[in-house]
């Protein structure tokens, strides 16, 4: 049943992305290993009866206390477990009572706003400039990084782009297919258009603009294959490490999503309305986008504190809560009144 869930049900019936399948598989594998160790039994002897509500709560507590996993990670794991057990209970009536218990488990409550990792425009430029446009690989990687930043797209959205999804005419834009096959169109900046025209001429010579070929690909043993998210992560790490020598603010390990976070933050800091930022990112709920407003406000608060000596009378009068999202000026900006 586990095999059918991951090999047939998720990819062929639910059309779940490879990234989500990997996440779900990792969760179920971790959970089964946890049950095995807690009950001191071989993996082959782990049964559905072991997956009680208490067991799941214990596993989530283990993630929180021993693995120091974030609330988001805990909830992702909980959602994966619920999805799997829902599938199982639809096919095995004897475990419905287990699913009923699991459904009652509450998700962990995150802080009102969690921190956002993002890079400055200088750091983004430093990473992009590590690519060598004189080589095929270097030029491809440069276009990839520029497009990732310009669109603020998720990794899977970038990987799914086909030639037919790109329009480089008077109103240049790209169509992205996000979570749940949700579609959105994102405008492209002229510098990005210039690079894309060169890239398509170089890597897709002879192909029509309406072709179904994936924009980014690699050639392995003479076979053309779509670029993988693992490859993109490697590319990010490679150029991130090189750029760190000239730009120390770049963290030791960077992930593709940091370009998305950075683009969103830069757009917000440049004055783009939060509703537009939300649409740009493809968020289904603007509350998800509020994290960027909070992060920017928190950054300003820290800058003010750093600029004010602790012994200063002014410093003593500063109240940090004044600069939270409840601030009237910020609220007016968030609601479009300013």
Locate predicted features:
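Conserved catalytic core of the tyrosine transesterase superfamily
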Residues: 1-338
